[in-house]
């Protein structure tokens, strides 16, 4: 064993060969090494020459351009084309090491700490990079907030999602300030009539039915009822029956209608006394000559059957002619506010288990929503609102003739039209449903609301059928504790991208 060569002798024979290798000659490997790439500065990028990572770079220092040596802006992605740089939201990275080079090191840690706090702030939501349309981007953002399953890393405040306009961005803040000031308002002062002016019902009566016992404080605070949601308030009834006297007639004017061509007055159901008509005729200061005035008692004026839009009801039929629709609508309808208040309303009404189930229904169509709206521009969204108003104008003519209780609502559940038969069936009149932000789920019982979200997720984005039926849909009446069992047939109207534009619900009562 002593004469055998050990391992050290074997290495001794090999090492001389390594010592003869020239270290100055690079050893070629099978895989070619890759050079590090750096973002060129604006000057080197303009000259199309190589640049280094440090700022200012050596080339700019030599040429005396160190003050202007900054990273060249990168080319925008296609989905960010047309969006100003000032409105783009700075990305939030989970890792400090992935911060942009142009951000200073001293404030990088502070901004990262603030962003981490924003992840725990309920007033911020996880958000995807902007769509081509602010309206579509805002609607997707609030949907992501509702289902609470977004894994993207951009965050913006909720109050910045409602609109691109400054006066709409702070709607929530203004509403909160107005609510605080409401306590100092003198309730003995006259009412502020913020409702439509073409109704005979006083604002006191309308808003007392809309908002309940706190109606005076809410109206006096000048809160926008179309941007802030207040649930409907059913009342107690000792007779346990609906009072259909709350239903106003179609002719809601306070004075009798007069048709000069036939020299005749039309009297509504509120004015049927002859002295009232004579006094109204004298006030009009009209010269009738030798003709005698005729009266049609309990006969509604033909003008009452003409469709008239209300421009103050932004979610409803706003205009009465197609020319007005195409000329006056110059901004898209924001579904974001409606989705936000719908989620707030559901949280107050249902438990956590029901909310998770409803959020799961909303999460099913979120990827389809992204695919359909990512390429839509602001002009596309304006065109969709024009289509909605134009379609609703035509449907209103048909709905007025069929005599079936019908309610029309948007994809966020916001009611935008009801006919007289639906008012009679449910007991809610048009002013109560359209004079504020009202959701279709507000007038449904709990089981019907659960079925509503399942049906909506089924037909809205997955099964592109034009109709669906809810076998049982129990409507809540203005009388607390009383419901009307119905069968509801849905008819869906879609826009050019396949998204649900409006839903028409025909309600037929189930007679036991």
Curated annotation (Swiss-Prot):
Lineage top rank: taxon: Eukaryota
Name of encoding gene: ERT1
Keyword list, A-Z: Activator, DNA-binding, Gluconeogenesis, Metal-binding, Nucleus, Transcription, Transcription regulation, Zinc
Location (main, coarse): nucleus
Chain's role: Transcription factor which regulates nonfermentable carbon utilization. Activator of gluconeogenetic genes.
Disordered: annotated segments: 95-118
Descriptive protein name: Transcription activator of gluconeogenesis
InterPro entries per record: ERT1_acuK_gluconeogen_tf, PAS, PAS-like_dom_sf, PAS_13, Zn2-C6_fun-type_DNA-bd_sf, Zn2Cys6_DnaBD
Polar residues composition bias: residue spans: 97-106
């Amino acid at each position: 064993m002593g004469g055998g060569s050990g391992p050290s002798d074997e290495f001794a024979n090999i090492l001389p060969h390594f010592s003869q290798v020239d270290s100055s000659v690079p050893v070629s490997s099978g895989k070619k090494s890759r050079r590090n790439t750096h973002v060129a500065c604006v000057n080197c990028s303009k000259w199309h020459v190589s640049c280094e990572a440090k700022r200012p770079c050596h080339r700019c220092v030599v040429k005396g351009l160190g003050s202007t040596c900054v990273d060249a802006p990168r080319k925008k992605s296609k989905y960010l084309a047309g969006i100003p740089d000032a409105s783009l939201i700075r990305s939030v990275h989970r890792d400090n090491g992935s911060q942009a080079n142009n951000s200073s090191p001293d404030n990088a840690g502070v901004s990262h700490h603030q962003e981490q706090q924003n992840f725990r702030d309920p007033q911020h939501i996880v958000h995807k990079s902007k769509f081509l349309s602010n309206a579509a981007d805002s609607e997707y953002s609030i949907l992501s907030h509702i289902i609470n399953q977004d894994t993207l890393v951009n965050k913006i405040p909720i109050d910045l999602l409602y609109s691109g306009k400054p006066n709409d961005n702070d709607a929530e803040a203004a509403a909160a300030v107005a609510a605080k000031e409401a306590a100092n308002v003198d309730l003995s002062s006259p009412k502020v009539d913020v409702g439509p002016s073409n109704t005979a019902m006083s604002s006191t009566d309308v808003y007392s039915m809309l908002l309940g016992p706190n109606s005076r404080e809410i109206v006096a605070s000048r809160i926008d009822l179309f941007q802030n949601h207040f649930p409907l308030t059913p009342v107690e009834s000792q007779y346990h029956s609906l009072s259909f006297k709350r239903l106003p007639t179609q002719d809601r004017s306070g004075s009798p209608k007069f048709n000069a061509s036939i020299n005749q007055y039309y009297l509504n159901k509120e004015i049927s006394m002859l002295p009232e008509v004579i006094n109204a005729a004298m006030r009009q200061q009209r010269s009738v000559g030798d003709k005698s005035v005729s009266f049609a008692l309990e006969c509604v004026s033909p003008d009452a059957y003409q469709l008239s839009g209300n421009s103050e009801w932004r979610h409803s039929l706003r205009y009465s002619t197609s020319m007005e629709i195409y000329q006056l609508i110059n901004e898209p309808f924001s579904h974001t506010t409606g989705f936000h208040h719908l989620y707030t309303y559901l949280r107050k009404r249902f438990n956590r288990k029901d909310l998770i189930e409803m959020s799961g229904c909303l999460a099913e169509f979120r990827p389809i929503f992204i695919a359909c709206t990512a390429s839509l521009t602001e002009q596309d969204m304006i065109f969709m609102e024009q289509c909605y108003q134009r379609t609703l104008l035509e449907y209103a003519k048909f709905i007025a003739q069929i005599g079936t209780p019908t309610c029309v609502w948007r994809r966020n559940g916001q009611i935008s039209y009801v006919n007289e038969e639906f008012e009679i069936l449910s007991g809610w009149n048009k002013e109560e449903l359209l004079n504020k932000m009202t959701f279709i789920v507000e007038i449904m019982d709990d089981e019907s609301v659960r079925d509503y979200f399942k049906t909506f997720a089924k037909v809205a984005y997955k099964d592109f059928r034009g109709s669906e039926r809810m076998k049982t849909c129990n409507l809540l009446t203005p009388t607390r504790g009383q419901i009307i069992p119905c069968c509801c047939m849905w008819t869906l109207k879609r826009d050019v991208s396949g998204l649900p534009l409006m839903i028409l619900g025909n309600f037929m009562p189930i007679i036991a």
